[in-house]
């Protein structure tokens, strides 16, 4: 049975975010690097570093938090995996869902790489819906 790397990444980020942690370390792979680059570009992450340790590469993520008098308030509200190894979900470019009227993002795996819903609509291509972030 293979590992579901997308689910692992989303779960680690979600758990660290709920716990109020500032930094998270996740195993690096091509798909996780591309998803993390999208999250960084969309403003959900503050910083990303690639770290080599014991023969393996890791990504060290700095989560974005808003500080208040009561403590840090999380920036990422929800991460939801849509496509799973046992059930793949695909969408055409015109039927890509909008999350909260465009406030959230949909991450897709397309023939042009990992893209957000806005980029996929602009290019007019569909693909596998990996996750929703809002």
Curated annotation (Swiss-Prot):
Keywords assigned:
Plastid, Ribonucleoprotein, Ribosomal protein, RNA-binding, rRNA-binding
Give the multimer and partner information: Part of the 30S ribosomal subunit.
Summary of the function given for this chain in its UniProt record: One of the primary rRNA binding proteins, it binds directly to 16S rRNA central domain where it helps coordinate assembly of the platform of the 30S subunit.
Question: Record's superkingdom?
Answer: Eukaryota
Q: Which GO terms describe its cellular component?
A: plastid; ribonucleoprotein complex; ribosome
Q: Name where it mostly resides.
A: plastid
Family to which the UniProt record says this protein belongs: Belongs to the universal ribosomal protein uS8 family.
Q: Source species, please?
A: Cuscuta gronovii
> Where, subcellularly, is it found?
Plastid
Q: Which GO terms describe its biological process?
A: translation
What the entry lists under PANTHER family is as follows:
40S RIBOSOMAL PROTEIN S15A
Under the heading HAMAP family, the entry gives:
Ribosomal_uS8_B
Q: Name one Pfam family in it.
A: Ribosomal_S8
Instruction: Write down the SUPFAM superfamilies for this protein, in alphabetical order.
Output: Ribosomal protein S8 (SSF56047)
> InterPro entries per the record?
Ribosomal_uS8 (IPR000630), Ribosomal_uS8_CS (IPR047863), Ribosomal_uS8_sf (IPR035987)
Q: What is this protein called?
A: Small ribosomal subunit protein uS8c
One GO molecular function term of this record is:
rRNA binding
Mind telling me which PROSITE patterns this protein's record contains?
Answer: RIBOSOMAL_S8 (PS00053)
